[in-house]
Structures are given as structure tokens and as C-alpha cells.
């Protein structure tokens, strides 16, 4: 174990396992209330999955939207997330995530100095469901100067190497082809970071300012637990590390160790579908889940993950192969996705979580996969306009791209019937000319259009023909950002035992826990939004403070949010 901040101690009020956004929110919130806190990170780098994420938060009825004149209500948001979760989410967690999110946001801004940008037109992912809105619920961190915030610690925060720009700037610039790359290079040299790394940097700086200690290479192995169960006064009083070191917690241990996607035996035994790749840190091996299970914690939702279509391109993290998320590669006008039969099988522009589920389909009569192997297919003109991942036209074709001079040649190389691929492209090209996709309705929703090209010469920003050879294919596999089921908690982030009673002294947040939205993915930031809210609620509960936060500003929906939350949360407390 290496202390990066503070000197080693054997006892703290609060021990936080993990250093992602949920962990740091819990740590900073508790430290702000005067608690002594230590953050213990398993890896040598801080930030976990959060640091390499998009950094966005899905917060319904947030004050930024209200101040901009955007009309949103907790009622509408709850109706929406109930539909997105397909009836599988627990009402207590839904209420906590939806009605306490803005309290978390205002607390971070006013008490901890974390700053955010409001995205006015980033649509909810499922525009077809009741309660969805076409903007206002997603926010993102502002650009942050990580060197100014953290000094020498800046290099200890994970990075995915992305250029420092916000999604608001992406909207303003319109497409990657118009990015001011020289300006972005200058920003990076000046220490500016964006997205998840900016969020983690601001949260980490806040926790340190409030007195939290931080250590790395500190893998938790076992909880110190007195008693046989919640009904006999059992309590978690600390943690034993893999190194054998013991750290006592006088008030609480917070598990925020990430998911279990990198433990292949756990993933294969729990997830509903085979996970072929992921892009999270390899340290996400279910440590916190096992620790909690050993003392009788309840688990829920472990069949699910934050699914996403990915490709294997040779990217690595901590020396391990990872998947690369496919976004514009499948959403831009002039590309399609075909299955093992050479046919389109879904709206390629839909959100990544739902599209990945289409990769999981099984053909029972044939006893084989229905749609995989699957490939994104595009032509030379697409490559010249947009590039694909980091590859640009004129460069040698990378190994992960399959090239064919003609569609039949490409079909032979990817193992699909040539006549099907040719017919599929011809049919899609006709749709591109008219601007309508009667097969899968691509380009109809605000979400589809958001990720299209507003300058597309064809009628629909999401549709364009594939006409100019050579043609290219990129294999698509079922991937995930991480798992999103695990330790069950109540609406205050207290871990529940198998009988549904809170385990004293134990809290959990983040991907180590059951998702508030169950199998659903409401919109951009639906991972970080609720997990940071639960981190805030954990910190407030440990400190004996109210869940709500009043910064003295007028909040039109504050009473409404309280009215909605209190009955559900009060019932859970009983």
C-alpha cells in the first residue's frame, strides 16, 4: 500500500474502497461533514472506470435545466425510468436516484467546487417511451486543469488519451471533421482535461481539500464483521487488505470497487449473455461483491451490464486487451451493420445498450447465434469523410479493418452470402435517397439525429448510401462498459442482508451494486448520475445529515421532489 495523500493510520471514521466518481463523492461528502476518511484504491492509478468515461450525469429535473427555462418534472422522469427499466427496478432506488440527484449536484457545486455544463439538447435514449425528453437531463463536467487541481498527483489519475473537449463543444462544432485540433493540442499541453478525467480530478481535489487520505495498491480482501447477522447486533468495523494490513472504521466502510466484468468465471456464471470484451480497468474483478457476500449481503441484478457494441482493435489498458466502443462508425450516414446472413438486423443509430442486446439474440431452431458474427460496413467515401476510429483515408489499412474492392469480395472475406449483402446495400441506398428507413426507422428520433451529420447532403442526417469502392467491414462484438448488478442496497446506500435488513456500518455505491435502473439505460450519464447520487447519500447518511440539500437558492421543484421521495424512502426505512 502506498499513501499518496496523508500518513498511514490504523483507524478512520470512514474507509472507502475504490476511487471512482461514486467512491470520491461519498468520501468528499463524509469528509465535508468532518469525518476522517481514507480512500483505498486497488490499482496504482486513481479514478477507476469513471476516469475513462464520458463523464456525463443523467440528472432529472436538475437546477441547470430549470434556470435555462427547460420544463421537466420528477413525475415525468419517474414514469420514464419505470418504463426503461422494464418494471424490474425497485421503487426505493428509483426514487432515490431521481429525486435526490439535484441535491447531490448542488452539494457538489456549492460545497465542493465541482463545476458542470448543462447540455440543452442531448436526448434521452428511448424517445418512444412515456416521460422521455429531447434534452435537459444530461450534464457534464466543465474542462478542468488537472495540473492546477492535483499537482504531482495528476499523473496518478487514469487517462484514456482523449482530446480535452466537452460535448457542448462537440455540438457547437458539429462533427469531428471540423474540430480545432491545434487548439485541443494546446489545451492538453496546458493541463486541461475533460469528461471523466475532469470529473475525477475535481472530486479527488475536493476530497483532499476536505482532509481525506488517499492510498493506492490497497486491495480490500475481507470485511471485519462482528456478529452472525443484522438481528444480533452485527456490524462492519473495518477491512483487511490483501497485504494483510488491517484498517478499522469507527463509523462505516463504503464499497465502491467497480463491477465484476474482468473476472471471467463470475461474468460467465452471472451475466445473461456472454461478454466478449470490455473497456474498463482490468482491476474490476468483483472484489467488493465477494467481500459483501461473505458476510451475508444480498445481491440483485447481476444478470445485467452496461452493454455496448465494441470492436477488437488492439487497444489495451494496463497491458490487457480491451474493446473499442463503436459509435459514429455505426451511426454516421453511409454505414450499416449486417449480421451473419449479410442482412441488417437493427437500427444502427439507436443507443448502444439496446443495440448490443440485438447482438445477444439466439437462433433456437438453428442452435446458434442469430446475428453474430456482425459487421459494420461502409465505403471509401465514408472513410474519406469521417475516418473510422483512429484510422484515416490514405493510411495503410489496419488489421482490424477488412477491405474488399467490391461488395461480393467483401462478403466472401467476412463470410456472408454475397447476394444478401449486395441486396441489403441496394435497399439501404434507396432509403438514404428518400431519407426514410421503413425497415428499422433509423434517423427518426432526436437521439438518432443527434449522432448523425447535420451537414449530410442526403435528406436524413443518419442515412447515406454506400456506393464507392473499396468497401470495408469492421467486426462488432457484444461488449460492456462494466457490469451493473451486484450488492443490494436501500435508498440510503446501506447494504442489505439476505433478509432485506441493513448491515450496520456497511454502504455500497457504483457498479459494485444493483443499478437503480435495473436493465434500463435512460440516457447519457445514467451510470454516473445515480451512482454519484448514492455516493452523496451514503456520505450524508454516515454523517447523520438529511438527504436533501439547501444551498439557499430558489428551487421550484424542491417541494415536489421531497413529496415524491419521502413516502417511498420512509417506507424503506421502516
UniProtKB/Swiss-Prot annotation:
Keywords tagged on the record: FAD, Flavoprotein, Oxidoreductase
EC numbers for this chain: 1.17.3.5
Protein purpose: Desaturase involved in a cyclohexanecarboxylate (CHCA) degradation pathway. Catalyzes the conversion of 4-oxocyclohexanecarboxylate (4-oxoCHCA) to 4-oxocyclohexenecarboxylate. Is highly specific for 4-oxocyclohexanecarboxylic acid and shows only slight activity with 4-oxo-2-methylcyclohex-2-enecarboxylic acid.
Protein name as catalogued: 4-oxocyclohexanecarboxylate 2-dehydrogenase
Record text on subunit structure and interactions: Monomer. Homodimer.
Ranges in coiled-coil conformation: none
UniProt GO MF annotations: steroid dehydrogenase activity, acting on the CH-CH group of donors
Transmembrane segments: none
Family in the record: Belongs to the FAD-dependent oxidoreductase 2 family.
Catalytic activities: 4-oxocyclohexane-1-carboxylate + O2 = 4-oxocyclohex-2-ene-1-carboxylate + H2O2
Record note on what altering residue 279 to A/M does: Still binds FAD but FAD is easily released by heat treatment or 50% ethanol
Enzyme class: oxidoreductase
Activity control note: Inhibited by 5,5'-dithio-bis(2- nitrobenzoate) and N-bromosuccinimide, but not by thiol and chelating reagents.
Cofactor(s) this protein requires: FAD
Pfam family, one: FAD_binding_2
pH dependence: Optimum pH is 7.2. Optimum pH is 7.6.
Induction and repression of expression: Induced by CHCA, trans-4-hydroxyCHCA and 4-oxoCHCA but not by 4-hydroxybenzoate (4-HBA).
Top-rank taxon: Bacteria
GO terms classed as biological process: steroid metabolic process
Amino acid at each position: 500500500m502506498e499513501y499518496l495523500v496523508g500518513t498511514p493510520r490504523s483507524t478512520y471514521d470512514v474507509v472507502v474502497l475504490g476511487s471512482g466518481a461514486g467512491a470520491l463523492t461519498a468520501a468528499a461528502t463524509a469528509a465535508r461533514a468532518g469525518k476522517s476518511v481514507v480512500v483505498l484504491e486497488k490499482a496504482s492509478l486513481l479514478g477507476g472506470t469513471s476516469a475513462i468515461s464520458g463523464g456525463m450525469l443523467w440528472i432529472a429535473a436538475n437546477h441547470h435545466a430549470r434556470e435555462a427555462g427547460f420544463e421537466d418534472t420528477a413525475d415525468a422522469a419517474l414514469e420514464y425510468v419505470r418504463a426503461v427499466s422494464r418494471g424490474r427496478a425497485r421503487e426505493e432506488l428509483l426514487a432515490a436516484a431521481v429525486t435526490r440527484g439535484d441535491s447531490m449536484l448542488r452539494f457538489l457545486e456549492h460545497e465542493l467546487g465541482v463545476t458542470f455544463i448543462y447540455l440543452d439538447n442531448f436526448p434521452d435514449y428511448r424517445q418512444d417511451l412515456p416521460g422521455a425528453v429531447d434534452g435537459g437531463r444530461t450534464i457534464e463536467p466543465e474542462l478542468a486543469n488537472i495540473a492546477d487541481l492535483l499537482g504531482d498527483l495528476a499523473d496518478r489519475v487514469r487517462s484514456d488519451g482523449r482530446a480535452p473537449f466537452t460535448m457542448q463543444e462537440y455540438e457547437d462544432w458539429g462533427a469531428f471533421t471540423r474540430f480545432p485540433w491545434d487548439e485541443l493540442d494546446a489545451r492538453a499541453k496546458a493541463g486541461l482535461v475533460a469528461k471523466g478525467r475532469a470529473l475525477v480530478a475535481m472530486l479527488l481535489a475536493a476530497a483532499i481539500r476536505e482532509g481525506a487520505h488517499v492510498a493506492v495498491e490497497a486491495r480490500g480482501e475481507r470485511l471485519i464483521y462482528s456478529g452472525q447477522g443484522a438481528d444480533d447486533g452485527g456490524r462492519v468495523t473495518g477491512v483487511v487488505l490483501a497485504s494483510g494490513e488491517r484498517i478499522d472504521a469507527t463509523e462505516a466502510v463504503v464499497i465502491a470497487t467497480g463491477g465484476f466484468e474482468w473476472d471471467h468465471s463470475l461474468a460467465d456464471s452471472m451475466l445473461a449473455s456472454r461478454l466478449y470484451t470490455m473497456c474498463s480497468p482490468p482491476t474490476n474483478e468483483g472484489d467488493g461483491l465477494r467481500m459483501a457476500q461473505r458476510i451475508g449481503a444480498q445481491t440483485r441484478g447481476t444478470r445485467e451490464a452496461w452493454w455496448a457494441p465494441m470492436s477488437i482493435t488492439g487497444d489495451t489498458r494496463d497491458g490487457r486487451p480491451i474493446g473499442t466502443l463503436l459509435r459514429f462508425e455505426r451511426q454516421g450516414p453511409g454505414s450499416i451493420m449486417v449480421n451473419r446472413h449479410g442482412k441488417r438486423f437493427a437500427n444502427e443509430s439507436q443507443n448502444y445498450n439496446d443495440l448490443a442486446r440485438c447482438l445477444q439474440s439466439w437462433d433456437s431452431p438453428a442452435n446458434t447465434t442469430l446475428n453474430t458474427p456482425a459487421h459494420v460496413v461502409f465505403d471509401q467515401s465514408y472513410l474519406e469523410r469521417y475516418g473510422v476510429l483512429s484510422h484515416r483515408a490514405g493510411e495503410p489499412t489496419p488489421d482490424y479493418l477488412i477491405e474488399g474492392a467490391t461488395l461480393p469480395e467483401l462478403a466472401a472475406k467476412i463470410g456472408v452470402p454475397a447476394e444478401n449483402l449486395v441486396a441489403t446495400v441496394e435497399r439501404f441506398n434507396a432509403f438514404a435517397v428518400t431519407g426514410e428507413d421503413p425497415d428499422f426507422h433509423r434517423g427518426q428520433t432526436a437521439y438518432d439525429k443527434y449522432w448523425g451529420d447535420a451537414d449530410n447532403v442526403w435528406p436524413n442526417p443518419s442515412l447515406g448510401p454506400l456506393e464507392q469502392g473499396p468497401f470495408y467491414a469492421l467486426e462488432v462484438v457484444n461488449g460492456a462498459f462494466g457490469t451493473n448488478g451486484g450488492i443490494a442496497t436501500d435508498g440510503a446506500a446501506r447494504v442489505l442482508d439476505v433478509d432485506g435488513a441493513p448491515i450496520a456500518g456497511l454502504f455500497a455505491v457504483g457498479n459494485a451494486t444493483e443499478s437503480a435502473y435495473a436493465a434500463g439505460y435512460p440516457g447519457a450519464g445514467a451510470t454516473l448520475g445515480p451512482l454519484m447520487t448514492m455516493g452523496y447519500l451514503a456520505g450524508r447518511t454516515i454523517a447523520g445529515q438529511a438527504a436533501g440539500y439547501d444551498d439557499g437558492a430558489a428551487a421550484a421543484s424542491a417541494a415536489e421532489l421531497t413529496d415524491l421521495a419521502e413516502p417511498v424512502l420512509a417506507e424503506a426505512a421502516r
